Curated annotation (Swiss-Prot):
This is Arginine--tRNA ligase. It catalyses: tRNA(Arg) + L-arginine + ATP = L-arginyl-tRNA(Arg) + AMP + diphosphate. Its EC number is 6.1.1.19. GO terms for biological process: arginyl-tRNA aminoacylation. GO terms for molecular function: arginine-tRNA ligase activity; ATP binding. The gene is argS. Keywords: Aminoacyl-tRNA synthetase, ATP-binding, Cytoplasm, Ligase, Nucleotide-binding, Protein biosynthesis. The lineage of its organism: Archaea, Methanobacteriati, Methanobacteriota, Stenosarchaea group, Halobacteria. One of its GO terms (cellular component) is cytoplasm. It is an enzyme of class 6 (ligase). Coiled coil: none annotated.
Amino acid sequence: MFIELRREVETALSEALDACGYPTDDLGIEEPPEDVDAVFASSVAFRLASAAEAPPPAVAGELAAELDAAGREYVGRIEQQGPYLNFFPSEAYFEEALEAGQSERFGELDSKDTSVVVEHTSANPTGPVHVGRARNPIIGDAVANLLSYAGYDVDRHYYVNDAGRQMAVFTWAYETFDESDLPEPARDRAEYRMVRYYRKGNEYLENADPDAVEAAEAEIQDILQGLEDGDEATYERVGEVVDTVLDGMKACLARLPAEFDEFVKETQFMRDGSTDDVVDRLQALDGAVYEDDAWQLAFADIDKNLVFLRADGTSLYTTRDIAHHEWKFDTYDRAVTVLGEDHKLQASQLRETLSLLGNDVDQLDNVIYSYVNLPEGKMSTRRGTGVQLDDLLDEAIDRAREEVETRLGDRLRDDDLDEADVERIAEQVGIGAVRYDIVAKQPSKAITFEWDRALDFEAQSAPYVQYVHARCCGILDEADGLDPEATIAPLDTDAERDLLRTVARLPGVIESAADDHQPHKIATYTRRLADRFNTFYRECPVTTADDAEVRRARLALVAAARHAMANALDILGVEAPESM
C-alpha cells in the first residue's frame, strides 16, 4: 500500500502544480520528521519560490488550495505546515496495510521480468577468505537478496581468477614441494591445507638462489603460456588446484551464508576464443598503442592506459574480464558487480573500454565498498597475515554464546532450552551480528568492527532487532489459539498506528534500496521497526488486553510486524530467531 499511496501523492501534487501553472518535473516528495504523523511530505514550495516570486509558505498555501483528498483511496487528508505539504493516510490505507502484513511474503514486489546477474566475492582462490574482504560477500549477498525481493530474476556469480600469475605460481608450488616440508595447516580444511604450498612457493621465489628462481620462473611461464594456448593438460593441472581451494572457500562462505548459482571461470573466455576476439577489436580502436613492450589502450578522460596484451602474446585479467562482461550483457538484462575500493580505476577502465567496443554500459552497475578494519588497524592479506573470516565467525559465536547464557533467566518463555538450542541461538546471533554490523553501514564508508557494538542486545544491533522478531513469535505462541483479525478500528492509539505506519513502509523501502543497490537502508528500517515495536510492546498489552476484539487486532499487528522484520532480516542475510 505504501507504493500505491506514494503514487496517489504524486498524482495529486502533479495535478495541483499543473493547475497553478508550475512545472511538474520535481515534486519534492520526502519522508516527514518523526514527530509528524504524515506518511509523505513535499518541499516543492522551496523549489518554486524564486519563479513564483513568493516565499515558500505562500507557494505551499497556493498549492494546498488546489489539493483535495476527496476521491483518493489511500490519501486521507492533506495539510499545509509552513512551507511543507503533508499527506496523511486514510483508514483504507491502514486496513489494507494490516491485511497485507498477514502474508509471510509481505514486502515482496511484483516481477519486473528483468534478469540481473550479481557478481560478488570473486576472491582469488589462493587461500582462506580474509576478514578484510568479508564485506564483499556480505554486501553482495544482501544486494542479490534485495533485488530478488524487488522482483528481479537474480543469478549470483563468483568470477574465478584461474588464469593469472598467482594461479600459475600456486600450481607450480603445489607440484614442486612435498607436504612434509610444510607447517601444519591452521584448520583441517582444503584451502588451509593448500595455502601452505602457495606461501612456500612465494617464499622460495623471494629467497632462493637466482639460478633456481630463474628455473622456477620458466616453469611458471610455461603454465601461463599453456593456459593462453588452450593446452588441455595445463588446464587440468591448474584446475585441480583451483577447484580444491574453492571447495574450502565455499565452506567458509556458506557459514555466512553466501552461496552462488554459478562459479564462472576466467579461462572460459580464453578457451572459447572470446578473449582473442576482444584483443583483435581493441587493437583496431583509435586509442590502441604498442609501447613499453605491450599493447595498451589510451583514454580521453582516464590518465592511466589499459594494458591488454603483453609482448609474449598473453592476455591480462582485465582483457578477459571484458569478454566476461560482454557475455554477461548477452545473457542478462542487467549486471551488478561488488568491488573493493582498490578496484575503482580498473572498474572505470573496464566501463570505458566496454563502451568503446559498442556495448551499452547502462546495463552495468558497480557497488564499491571500503574495507573492514579491526580496532588495532587495517588488516593485510599479504604473506598470510591478518585474521581469517573463519576466525571472526568463531569468535562471534563464542561471544554470542556467553551473552545468551547470561540472559537465560530473562527469557520471554518458560520452556527449557537444551545445549543444542543454545548453540543454535548463539550461531544465529553471532553470525547475524557480524553480517548486520557490516551491511548496516554505507558501503563507501570504512568500518572498524567492534564486538561491544555488534553484540549489544540493548543498542541498535543485530541482537536488538532479532530480539523483536523472537518477541513477536513469543506473543503469537502465547495467544492460545486466538486468531488474529486484521481490523483497524480497534487500533487507535499512537503506538499502534506508529507501528503499523512503519510496517507498511517495507515495500517502499525495498523498492528504493533496490534502485540504489543500498541494503543498508533495509538495516535502518529494521532499527526503526524495532523501536516502534518496543514502544507498542510497552504500551499495548496483547494477549492480556481486556477486549477480545482489541486482542485479535493487536495479534494481527504483531503478525504483520513479525513478517516485516523476518523479511527485512532475510534481505540482509541475518537469521530471524523464533526464540532467544
